[in-house]
Amino acid sequence: MQINNQTGLNEWGLFTNSGIKITADEDAEKLMYQAAHYEMVASALVVKMGHEINSEFKIGCMMAMGPTYPATPAPQDVMKAERTMQAGYWLADIQCKGKYPNWLKRYFERHHFALDITEADLNILAVGRTVDYIGFSYYASHVTKTDDYCC
């Protein structure tokens, strides 16, 4: 029996710290985004290599799913829920679409995160190295509400 479905990254998430020891004088959020970028490049290379080994392989990723819903139909709550979902699932955007979402690029600019993202990295992400499927682990749904416009 041959196994053709492979999962490269299992339940990844941005703020797992990727094993990084962060000192008090370092920007933890920036470092975690940088680590996540390297993980995305590594994942894209795994997908590429897997397809080169066997074109029948289906290589995917798996994410912990916890959808967030607005507490009310108020636009502020809807926007907060959308932003919360974006913050939790942007890695899937990169793995499926092969590029960073525009909202995240703007976030990096606003927070002055000059990450080490090279043209070669972007090419690796973009050119035929996206996952074939996404697996989900569902744990719980969440509800969010805000009194202020969040974005």
Spans of model-derived segments:
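Active-site region of glycoside hydrolase catalytic domains
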Residues: 1-151
